[in-house]
Amino acid sequence: AGGSESDNWALKATAEAYASKGKHIITTKIEHHAILHTCEYLEKRGFEITYLNVDRDGLISLDELKAAIRPDTILISVMFANNEIGTIEPIAEIGEIAKEHGVLFHTDAVQAYAQVPIHVDEMHIDMLSASGHKLNGPKGIGFLYIRKGVKIRSFVHGGAQERSRRAGTENIPGIVGLGAAVERAMRIMDSKTRKEIELRDYLIGRLENEIPHCWLNGHRTKRLPNNINFSFLFIEGESMLIMLDMKGICASSGSACTSGSLDPSHVLLAIGLKHEEAHGSLRLTLSEDSTKEEMDIVAEEVKKIVQRLRDMSPLYEDFLKSQKNN
């Protein structure tokens, strides 16, 4: 349930409903695995998927999108904001292009919903996925917004619940909890966003200015208010996570949904990072409860840990030797 089911439903049920019109779907290389794996599933069943490239900031090219649309294109699915690097895509422009070509537009807004303003009519969004756990709501509950008039097949067959589109007894506690979480998130969004942007930019500035051989991943301004993603050369991100955890700091080296994987992030590879650069990444997520004091603590600990790991790194030692020789 939640965001993954919503993404699956949007793609699979739309593909089935519009298969007579065409079997071509457009998405991006940096989508959540709930989209990418669903696309792989559809490819095995005769659908053709075009995966759009992104630039170094994680943004798609609108010209590439326009060029990818064909007479048999039935759906464009582009995430609103990336869960790893925080980049916010040009959703309104994508929606306008989709509308002009008579193609349905779905956006995975799990990471962006209640973080940034979303207007489904102005942005020409036909379907939108969201999840409660990103709003401090219950886990395992989410929703799929479907514009009136969009044909979509039932995802779970059985009873007539949810307008006969998703059978099964409704999770009433989850639904009520999600509703309460959305109401609260919308109420505090403006003040929360202002606070998070201020703290985010403060911490980004400290890390950039005080740690050499590192950089920010994702767009500097077109990004989620609460997202920070850095790459640090000459270290392994997993080692940094362990040492941060010992200091009581929660972080990740990629998507929380792939925390058990040793493979480099597909998102970081898609924006052009080398494998070793992607392995040295750190993702930090802020909240409404974050403070400037905590940002200072994180900055100081990251500085110490990066230096400690580099002191043990043969790659860093080789780099220093090469600098001396030059």
Positions of the model-derived regions?
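Pyridoxal 5′-phosphate
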Residues: A1-N326
